[in-house]
């Protein structure tokens, strides 16, 4: 059985990479979270997740991160291509089901301006 994993190259890892996305990226605001993205020169898109510690409970924070990673892994085609994408989860975010995050991301990426289909 083959495992479908995201390689380490699929993640924003360094602090300066997050800073670059926060400073120069475009923002899409959802309910309880913001997607910030910045086009890059790599062949694939990369994911970064930022969950505020004011969202109480490490179990909740880790579950949110796990669900966002899984959504990114399964639906990479709805995100901007060749971009660094950071999910900034705000303290008021409440996750009732994994389907909720997929619908929220899908509704943001289905915006009329079509920013999620931009090509580098």
From Swiss-Prot:
UniProt xrefs under SUPFAM superfamilies: Ribosomal protein S5 domain 2-like
One Pfam family hit: Ribonuclease_P
InterPro entries xref list: Ribosomal_Su5_D2-typ_SF, Ribsml_uS5_D2-typ_fold_subgr, RNase_P, RNase_P_CS
GO terms for MF: 3'-tRNA processing endoribonuclease activity; ribonuclease P activity; tRNA binding
Known function: RNaseP catalyzes the removal of the 5'-leader sequence from pre-tRNA to produce the mature 5'-terminus. It can also cleave other RNA substrates such as 4.5S RNA. The protein component plays an auxiliary but essential role in vivo by binding to the 5'-leader sequence and broadening the substrate specificity of the ribozyme.
Subunit structure: Consists of a catalytic RNA component (M1 or rnpB) and a protein subunit.
PANTHER family: RIBONUCLEASE P PROTEIN COMPONENT
Protein family membership: Belongs to the RnpA family.
Name of this protein: Ribonuclease P protein component
């Amino acid at each position: 059985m083959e495992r479908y994993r995201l390689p380490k190259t699929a993640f924003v890892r360094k602090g300066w990479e997050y800073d670059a996305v926060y400073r120069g990226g475009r923002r899409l605001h959802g309910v309880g979270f913001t997607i910030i993205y910045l086009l890059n020169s790599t062949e694939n898109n990369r994911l970064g997740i930022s969950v505020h510690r004011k969202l109480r409970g490490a179990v909740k924070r880790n579950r949110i991160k796990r669900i966002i990673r899984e959504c990114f892994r399964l639906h990479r085609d709805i995100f901007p291509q060749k971009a660094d994408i950071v999910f900034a989860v705000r303290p008021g975010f409440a996750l009732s089901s994994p389907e909720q995050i997929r619908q929220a991301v899908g509704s943001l990426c289905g915006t009329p301006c079509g920013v999620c289909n931009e090509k580098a």
